[in-house]
Amino acid sequence: MRYKNMFETLKKQEKMAFIPFVTLGDPNYALSFEIVKTLIASGVSALELGFAFSDPVADGVTIQASHLRALKHASMAKNFQLLRAIRDYNPHIPIGLLAYANLIFSYGVDNFYAQIKECGVDSVLIADMPLIEKELVLKSAQKHQIKQIFIASPNASNKDLERAAMHSQGYIYTLARSGVTGASRILENDASAIIKTLKTFSPTPALLGFGISKKEHIKNAKGMGADGVICGSALVKIIEENLNDENAMLERIKGFIGEMIS
């Protein structure tokens, strides 16, 4: 319901969704909470929060470093605790999780979905789980009313795009390019054909991710037919560059978000 309300409100305002990604516990749990509070106060549409993992294969160097910083003190219990705190802090903002399959399967699929539901999470995207394996999680996602998000990639067949569109709830994570995460100077690929194809299969909003780091990228994404963007590496880079100055970090995050959504 939170995603539905968000997209309906944005549509009335003729605005794009802007969803930031950060890793929970980076650089520590207390500051991670302050970062999330700053993001919310800066007017982001929703949150995409990562669980730190030792082998984040879908991520480039910036977010890999973020995982490593968080792993120094990360635990599933602390992740859940912070998620609860975020949900208590703001009951309305959609919260999405980005996790790697191993974390979910080692915890127990149904246990994991039950736990995140209790924490107030709205959606889950499993970074390294192909669509073909969707049945391993869909039953638990539906049982616990968690929206399962799937990825639509530039090299996907029409059949795979149809599956991603039909099974994704909340939104479809559409890749601006293949490869791993990372901020780009320019959006190299035109995702308009993929987005157009997705929209023939489902009305579920398509969000563009991978490489979003400038205001003009959001304009480009809008021109491609996307309903919003997900921005990770450019934001995580600000965290990395200001590890020794918490106030400067939060101010720079605030400035960056303001610039992106103005």
Curated annotation (Swiss-Prot):
Pfam families: Trp_syntA (PF00290). Signal peptide: none annotated. GO terms for molecular function: tryptophan synthase activity. The keyword Amino-acid biosynthesis applies. GO terms for cellular component: cytosol. It comes from the Bacteria. It is an enzyme of class 4 (lyase). The alpha subunit is responsible for the aldol cleavage of indoleglycerol phosphate to indole and glyceraldehyde 3-phosphate. Belongs to the TrpA family. This is Tryptophan synthase alpha chain. It comes from Helicobacter pylori (strain Shi470).
